[in-house]
């Protein structure tokens, strides 16, 4: 079973990672191609392409200029500890034991606009490139054209050898669209997180993002081996609702006080 999660815009390069080992991203060469395309844009061009403020555009132009084809401990950090958004707050990697981090390394894939797909301990250099960015490239008009077949093929490689391969999708729609479902040789199970608000259960973005990370945390703590094991998810008040679920769409709900 392989869990898919999205990256985060926020990055943390101030605090050291608690694990020394890190790997090189599988699609490093392809990421280098995209960096080459991004370097063709000045600050104004990046601001327009990504709808960024001038300071953020300047920051990322500097990041692209500094990007190295050889990630090291000095210019990078394991992705699991570098990403710092809501999903990663829920996952709480810094609180996991070494064996639990190793479990995450083997059972989680992080989708990325720049790197395509990452293992959690792959060396991540600072960047910003969302999957929905319309960056023209030799394969098409956007990053979906650039990545789609490659990502699915890589996920198939990671799932090779499993008798009944399952992908648990915890990524956003923007990122999961980069996976070519026609090429993916696995059952896909979607997890949906809803909170009670205004007299109905609704997906509330902040809570849902955090819950996706909590689900990865739960799976690591319990070494989950099948979707059935995820039905016991109970972190921060969520509970599986069988009546609202379908075989490949697991719904978790909660009512906050």
Curated annotation (Swiss-Prot):
It comes from the Bacteria. GO terms for biological process: response to hydroperoxide. InterPro entries: YaaA. One of its GO terms (cellular component) is cytosol. PANTHER family: PEROXIDE STRESS RESISTANCE PROTEIN YAAA, PEROXIDE STRESS RESPONSE PROTEIN YAAA. Belongs to the UPF0246 family. This is UPF0246 protein Mpe_A2092. It comes from Methylibium petroleiphilum (strain ATCC BAA-1232 / LMG 22953 / PM1).
């Amino acid at each position: 079973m392989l869990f898919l999660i999205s990256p985060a815009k926020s990055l943390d390069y101030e605090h050291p990672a608690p694990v020394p080992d890190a790997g090189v991203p599988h699609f490093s060469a392809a990421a280098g191609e995209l960096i080459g395309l991004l370097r063709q844009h000045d600050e104004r061009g990046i601001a327009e392409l990504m709808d960024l403020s001038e300071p953020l555009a300047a920051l990322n132009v500097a990041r692209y200029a500094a990007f190295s084809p050889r990630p090291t401990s000095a210019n990078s950090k394991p992705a699991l500890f570098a990403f710092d958004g809501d999903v990663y707050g829920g996952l709480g990697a810094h609180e996991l034991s070494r064996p639990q981090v190793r479990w995450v390394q083997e059972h989680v894939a992080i989708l990325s606009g720049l790197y395509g797909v990452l293992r959690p301990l792959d060396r991540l250099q600072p960047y910003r490139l969302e999957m929905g960015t319309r960056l023209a490239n030799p394969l098409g008009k956007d990053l979906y054209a650039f990545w789609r077949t490659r990502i699915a093929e890589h996920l198939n490689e990671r799932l090779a050898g499993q008798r009944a391969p399952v992908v648990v999708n915890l990524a956003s729609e923007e990122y999961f669209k980069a996976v070519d479902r026609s090429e993916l040789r696995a059952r896909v199970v979607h997890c949906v997180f809803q909170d009670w608000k205004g007299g109905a259960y609704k997906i509330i973005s902040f809570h849902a993002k955090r819950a996706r990370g909590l689900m990865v945390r739960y799976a690591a703590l319990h070494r989950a081996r099948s979707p059935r094991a995820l039905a016991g998810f109970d972190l921060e008040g969520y509970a599986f609702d069988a009546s609202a679920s379908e075989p490949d769409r697991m719904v978790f709900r909660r009512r906050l006080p």
